[in-house]
Amino acid sequence: MQEWFQNLFAATLGLGDLGITVGLVVSVIVKIVIILIPLILTVAYLTYFERKVIGFMQLRVGPNVTGPRGLIQPFADVFKLLFKEVTRPKLSNKALFYIGPIMSLAPSFAAWAVIPFNEEWVLTNINIGLLYILMITSLSVYGVIIAGWASNSKYSFLGAMRASAQSISYEIAMSAALVCVVMVSGSMNFSDIVAAQAKGIAGGSVFSWNWLPLFPIFIVYLISAVAETNRAPFDVAEGESEIVAGHHVEYSGFAFALFFLAEYIFMILIAALTSLMFLGGWLSPFPQSWGIVGTPSAFWMFVKMAAVLYWYLWIRATFPRYRYDQIMRLGWKVLIPIGFAYIVVLGVWMISPLNLWK
């Protein structure tokens, strides 16, 4: 695509060297649009799917009025949010009040720049893709803190403090889990990490993926991922029964929609990251000798992401909310020690004769 645009602007339109630069910029913009539009549509229908799944588990119907089987409900919700008035508390900080939602949403979009869907479908294939993801996603906590403080509300500020403390705490446990994957893969490039999962004793099958030899740390990662995205049962940052709606209690209309969009995009990002790091990415769960079913494809990447997202919804419909002190105790006294201990265990394992990743 990049070469096509560069040839178009340089040769066809006669812009020369300037056309090469313009073609590069245009190709990047087109790639960004190709990623963001399906992502936003996925968020819209993920909300619909969430309400349907939870309704089914609670013996309800879920959305069924707007359109056939309620399929147009996400668009009705979008129009409602777009046309609602964006109110602001009188004593709030106007500039920071509007910067908060933007700072929460921007990192969730920027993180997708390095997420590959197969060996070719990636915006930017860099060797420190995992480090970039950890760095860019950690910035979203600033948007939460700014929104909570700028609202000039005790409920918003308390929710922001809870959300930021929880996010920072579980980021440590999640990072420890991802360090284990880097150790066995020998790279922070997502394509290399996926390729490494096709090797080993059980190479070419579901049993060679990282979830099996790293199963204890895989569980630590999954729990940390739910807490990192402030989803149930770790959603104390917006506990309706305690602090109304957390850091975005004073937001309405389009400003609230930005927080909402950021939360669900982070969910999808975690699903993609889980697929790449532990579930083989675009690798097929079947041996390649099975023909087209065993061929690596972006289809398998999307299937695994959908499975992780369904797991998110199942967790929300099943488990009650934790108390805040229980969440912090689980993170600091259980998950973080397990994460660091497993790094040591894995290091010893890899230098022993029982190394599975040779």
Curated annotation (Swiss-Prot):
Its EC number is 7.1.1.-. One of its GO terms (biological process) is aerobic respiration. Its main location: membrane. Keywords: Cell inner membrane, Cell membrane, Membrane, NAD, Quinone, Translocase, Transmembrane, Transmembrane helix, Ubiquinone. The keyword Acetylation does not apply. GO terms for molecular function: NADH dehydrogenase activity; oxidoreductase activity, acting on NAD(P)H, quinone or similar compound as acceptor; quinone binding. InterPro entries: NADH_UbQ_OxRdtase_su1/FPO, NADH_UbQ_OxRdtase_su1_CS. It is a multi-pass membrane protein. It catalyses: a quinone + NADH + 5 H(+)(in) = a quinol + NAD(+) + 4 H(+)(out). GO terms for cellular component: plasma membrane. It holds the Pfam family NADHdh. The keyword ATP-binding does not apply. It is found in: Cell inner membrane. The chain crosses the membrane at residues 20-40, 95-115, 128-148, 168-188, 206-226, 253-273, 295-315, 334-354. NDH-1 is composed of 14 different subunits. Subunits NuoA, H, J, K, L, M, N constitute the membrane sector of the complex. Belongs to the complex I subunit 1 family. NDH-1 shuttles electrons from NADH, via FMN and iron-sulfur (Fe-S) centers, to quinones in the respiratory chain. The immediate electron acceptor for the enzyme in this species is believed to be ubiquinone. Couples the redox reaction to proton translocation (for every two electrons transferred, four hydrogen ions are translocated across the cytoplasmic membrane), and thus conserves the redox energy in a proton gradient. This subunit may bind ubiquinone. This is NADH-quinone oxidoreductase subunit H. It comes from Neisseria gonorrhoeae (strain ATCC 700825 / FA 1090). The lineage of its organism: Bacteria, Pseudomonadati, Pseudomonadota, Betaproteobacteria, Neisseriales.
